[in-house]
Amino acid sequence: MGNHEGFPVDTFPTDAERGSNVSIEWLYDSVVDLAWADNLVTEDKEMFLKNGFYTTLIQPGLRLISLNTNFCQGGNFFLFLDFSDPAEQLKWLTEQLTHSEQKGSLASIISRLYF
């Protein structure tokens, strides 16, 4: 997902910031329905639908971790509300990597980088 998919452009509220006037669910729902419906198990879909990041087991011993770097996009004014760790994604990433390390598994991280 790119930063221009949200509306207004660059606007990506976290789950905690969404309410009656702010929504990003339409985008996350569309991505899951159109692209990943058959590729993610229910738990992974639920994680993505909450804040746009997820992890999934690709094969035994290999986990894919997908980050939502849109939270860190400079134009995302929701950063003013939580600029240290939007949606606690970094905390979650640390937990995922620790879990993989403890199991002796590999983890591959994907995300979109902005230039």
Where are the model-predicted features located?
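Extended active-site neighborhood of metal-dependent phosphoesterases/phosphodiesterases
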Residues: 1-95
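Active-site-proximal segments of metal-dependent phosphoesterases and phosphodiesterases across multiple
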Residues: 74-84, 98-115
